[in-house]
């Protein structure tokens, strides 16, 4: 009996370790727009983008670190966890909730810049997702909000998606009932938009 137990112990010890996925990581880092709020599992843009990349023969693995309701302050607090993933590329999609809450754009800019700088220092290529807001937030605030993304992209030489929800926001064909969050069809448009900016980086 002891011999059998010993043999089983040895066999367990020599079991091969799980093989880690060797593909470089593209990190989808954002809020509900990245998390895939309100759509069936697999319908969000990170999952759709993974299927697109697989079909095109790109050997990358997408990690979804989207959290619904997150702000740039929340993203900054999660920064080390994001770096621990050791991404090669990050799609940084944060700021919409800051704008909807009327957070000062100086704070938005400082938070985004801290994340951008940390990613770049770690050798991560950053794609910045730009945002806009409903005009009832006031023309001056909306203009200042939009300029944060343009300014940071220019300052840090980042590929910029001018408006992450281009063709989606406000269109009931592509959104949930809130006219903001994409539905599954809306995420097809978002995925294509991200891929358009991402693919030139992958081809380098």
Residue ranges of predicted features:
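Bacterial Sec-dependent signal peptides at the C-terminal "C-region" and cleavage site
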Residues: 1-23
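N-terminal helical cap/lid subdomain that shapes the substrate entry/recognition surface
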Residues: 69-73
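Alpha-helical cap/lid subdomain in secreted, periplasmic
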Residues: 21, 48, 58, 74-204
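Serine-esterase "nucleophile elbow" of acetyl-processing enzymes
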Residues: 17-68, 78-86
């Amino acid at each position: 009996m002891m011999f059998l137990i010993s043999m089983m112990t040895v066999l367990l010890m020599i079991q091969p370790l799980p093989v880690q996925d060797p593909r470089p990581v593209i990190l989808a880092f954002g809020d509900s727009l990245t998390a895939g709020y309100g759509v069936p599992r697999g319908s969000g843009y990170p999952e759709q983008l993974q299927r697109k990349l697989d079909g095109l023969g790109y050997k990358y693995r997408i990690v979804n670190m989207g959290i619904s309701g997150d702000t740039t302050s929340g993203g900054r607090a999660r920064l080390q966890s994001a770096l621990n993933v050791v991404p090669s590329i990050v799609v940084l999609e944060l700021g919409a909730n800051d704008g909807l809450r009327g957070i000062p754009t100086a704070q938005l800019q400082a938070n985004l810049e801290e994340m951008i700088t940390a990613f770049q220092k770690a050798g991560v290529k950053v794609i910045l997702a730009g945002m806009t807001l409903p005009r009832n937030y006031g023309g001056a605030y909306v203009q200042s909000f939009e300029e944060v993304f343009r300014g940071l992209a220019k300052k840090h030489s980042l590929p910029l998606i001018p408006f992450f929800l281009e063709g989606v926001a406000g269109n009931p064909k592509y959104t949930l009932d809130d006219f903001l969050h994409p539905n599954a069809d809306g995420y097809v448009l978002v995925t294509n938009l991200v891929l358009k900016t991402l693919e030139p980086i992958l081809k380098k």
